């Protein structure tokens, strides 16, 4: 699985004007299941992200996790993280998991983040979503399982 993690002051996701999820301080996690991924990869990535120390401590150093700060997570599916741009001008997405697997793993990943004690909001798999965020830092991290 691939994830792009952004430390945010706030974030929200809407579909056709309907607010699906919003958070205050925490993490916006854009996630993509790849060919061959399973629940083990989703669980491992969620556990790593839950422990990722990218929030400032009292000394101003990035030494606290989203759990440590009481922050939340907004988890949004984004198959375009599987883009292959090595040839031509049009990205290919064949490395992404098939839609049924992608949706199952996206839901599993979000549930695993929540199981880590992090309040979790989500988007809608496969929908044309509008994501708003106020990046804090900015801090943006790329992770793969």
Curated annotation (Swiss-Prot):
GO molecular function, one term: Gly-tRNA(Ala) deacylase activity
Pfam families xrefs: Tyr_Deacylase (PF02580)
Superkingdom field: Bacteria
One cellular-component annotation, GO: cytoplasm
Enzyme Commission number: 3.1.1.96
GO terms, biological process: D-amino acid catabolic process
Protein name, per record: D-aminoacyl-tRNA deacylase
Record's comment describing the protein's domains: A Gly-cisPro motif from one monomer fits into the active site of the other monomer to allow specific chiral rejection of L-amino acids.
Family: Belongs to the DTD family.
Protein purpose: An aminoacyl-tRNA editing enzyme that deacylates mischarged D-aminoacyl-tRNAs. Also deacylates mischarged glycyl-tRNA(Ala), protecting cells against glycine mischarging by AlaRS. Acts via tRNA-based rather than protein-based catalysis; rejects L-amino acids rather than detecting D-amino acids in the active site. By recycling D-aminoacyl-tRNA to D-amino acids and free tRNA molecules, this enzyme counteracts the toxicity associated with the formation of D-aminoacyl-tRNA entities in vivo and helps enforce protein L-homochirality.
Cited InterPro entries: Daa-tRNA_deacyls_DTD, DTD-like_sf
Compartmental location: Cytoplasm
Catalytic reaction equation(s): glycyl-tRNA(Ala) + H2O = tRNA(Ala) + glycine + H(+); a D-aminoacyl-tRNA + H2O = a tRNA + a D-alpha-amino acid + H(+)
Subunit text: Homodimer.
Motif Gly-cisPro motif, important for rejection of L-amino acids mapped to chain: 137-138
Keywords assigned by UniProt, alphabetized: Cytoplasm, Hydrolase, RNA-binding, tRNA-binding
């Amino acid at each position: 699985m691939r994830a792009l993690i952004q430390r945010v002051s706030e974030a929200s996701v809407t579909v056709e004007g309907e607010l699906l999820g919003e958070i205050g301080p925490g993490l916006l996690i854009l996630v993509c299941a790849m060919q061959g991924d399973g629940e083990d990869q989703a669980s491992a990535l969620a556990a790593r992200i839950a422990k990722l120390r990218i929030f400032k401590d009292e000394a101003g150093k990035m030494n606290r996790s989203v759990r440590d700060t009481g922050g939340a997570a907004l988890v949004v599916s984004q198959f375009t993280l599987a883009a292959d741009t090595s040839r031509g001008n049009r990205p290919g997405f064949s490395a992404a998991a098939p839609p049924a697997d992608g949706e199952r793993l996206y839901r599993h990943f979000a549930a695993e983040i929540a199981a880590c004690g992090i309040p979790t909001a989500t988007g809608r798999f496969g929908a044309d979503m509008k994501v708003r965020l106020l990046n804090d830092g900015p801090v943006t991290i790329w992770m793969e399982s």
